């Protein structure tokens, strides 16, 4: 069964999707989130001059919210309560080398959720980048966007 079919079948029965869902669905959703994270797939893109929404990608993101429980994360200045798979964000645990390899600048107070893509030479001023976002190369997301 294709990735698209797995997601569409799960979507039709989304009221049954939970943290107890089978591993094949979890693996499929996680693969899509990983692919979003590296820019391999996009929720929407311009094809032949027209914007196209890839519904199965959008559905996979929405299913992920049903699949993962809420968790608490305590930091030195605050605490957060969010879905477990998104809590720590895209750059959690990154070294200086990881940031240099990614090639984008993010100033403090610019959380970037896992499952979002940020291109090289992008600049993130204080902003919030949600799962599914695609920030192309050289783009600036300005303060509080």
Where do the language-model regions lie?
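Structural signal for interior beta-strand "rungs" in well-ordered beta-sheet cores
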Residues: 100, 104-145
């Amino acid at each position: 069964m294709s990735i698209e079919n797995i997601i569409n079948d799960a979507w039709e029965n989304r009221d049954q999707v939970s943290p107890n869902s089978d591993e094949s669905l979890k693996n499929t959703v996680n693969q899509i989130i990983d692919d979003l994270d590296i820019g391999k797939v996009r929720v929407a893109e311009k094809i032949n001059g027209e914007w196209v929404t890839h519904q199965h990608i959008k559905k996979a993101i929405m299913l992920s919210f049903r699949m993962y429980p809420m968790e608490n994360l305590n930091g030195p200045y605050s605490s957060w309560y969010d879905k477990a798979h998104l809590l720590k964000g895209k750059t959690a645990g990154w070294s200086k080398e990881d940031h240099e390899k990614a090639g984008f600048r993010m100033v403090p107070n610019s959380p970037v959720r896992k499952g979002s893509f940020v291109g090289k030479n992008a600049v993130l001023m204080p902003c919030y980048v949600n799962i599914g976002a695609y920030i192309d190369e050289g783009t600036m997301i300005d303060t509080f966007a």
